[in-house]
Amino acid sequence: MERITVTLGERSYPITIAAGLFNEPASFLPLKSGDQVMLVTNETLAPLYLDKVRGVLERAGVNVDSVILPDGEQYKSLTVLDTVFTALLKKPHGRDTTLVALGGGVIGDLTGFAAASYQRGVRFIQVPTTLLSQVDSSVGGKTAVNHPLGKNMIGAFYQPASVVVDLDCLKTLPARELASGLAEVIKYGIILDADFFTWLEGNLDALLRLDGPAMAYCIRRCCELKAEVVAADEREAGLRALLNLGHTFGHAIEAEMGYGNWLHGEAVAAGIVMAARASERLGQFSSADTQRIIALLERAGLPVNGPCEMSAQDYLPHMLRDKKVLAGELRLVLPLAIGKSEVRGGVSHEVVLSAIADCQQA
């Protein structure tokens, strides 16, 4: 069992990583006998894990209610959020309740925002079931729902009480979802850790076949990097923005194509290559390193070009609504070398459009 602490003073919390955690009531600390829980999951995961998690919590004396939501990025919305609020109010659940997010990034983000909002804030626990959510979205307290005009535009910074990463969940993960998560894994190597990127080049095949030790190390290293960044910059005033490599371009793809048509990691993968191309055009990133990135993404089964349905001009309206925009100026996360990156303002639209055009499908 691995345990990593996100250090935020009195709001610090553990990330527990191991196989078989759903069999151990102690995995779900700080829950205790007599606590009330609303377990939030989706229609795909409920048949797989709902009864198992409910059972382990009830054996610990926890009172468990549940709400099952539709599955998909398109349901990460205010309308579906209201379904959670209605379930909480009907029981009813008070300020001493705990929300448990059992699912991937959509469930985690939506449940976290529900916890931040319900009765001005209640406790919640992240139980991520996809690789993407285990290495990224469950850690750090970013919670949100989407708006038709932009991804994650309505939300809050709100930290969980704990994160429970059961590696066994990856056994039921579709191959496309596994690849989507690998985009975020590869991102960490590009922005923060050249040695980890090199490790990924040598161990990607092991990750694709869900090799236990390789996957445990991969998830642990990603969580360590994320925990360090969040501890240093919880509210994304500087360093934490680096975690958005590829996301400004990627969010534009998701919004323009319709949420769910491109998985988040797929859009981020294409966005990472666009960011690398932009950095190349600015003379601060080598084409050889871009090719290393492209090769690793392609081995993971990820796209390295944007959708053929989008022109370069289609990206800009979405990108200018990005949360990193200041005073109307586009700011991009750009790689400087494998393992090193920066947030750069003042990148011309010409450079951005050219970088996108470099990544257009033929």
Swiss-Prot record:
One of its GO terms (cellular component) is cytoplasm. Zn(2+) binds at residues 184, 247, 264. The keyword Plastid does not apply. Keywords: Amino-acid biosynthesis, Aromatic amino acid biosynthesis, Cobalt, Cytoplasm, Lyase, Metal-binding, NAD, Nucleotide-binding, Zinc. It catalyses: 7-phospho-2-dehydro-3-deoxy-D-arabino-heptonate = 3-dehydroquinate + phosphate. NAD(+) binds at residues 71-76, 105-109, 129-130, 142, 151, 169-172. Its EC number is 4.2.3.4. One of its GO terms (biological process) is chorismate biosynthetic process. Catalyzes the conversion of 3-deoxy-D-arabino-heptulosonate 7-phosphate (DAHP) to dehydroquinate (DHQ). This is 3-dehydroquinate synthase. It comes from Salmonella paratyphi B (strain ATCC BAA-1250 / SPB7). The gene is aroB.
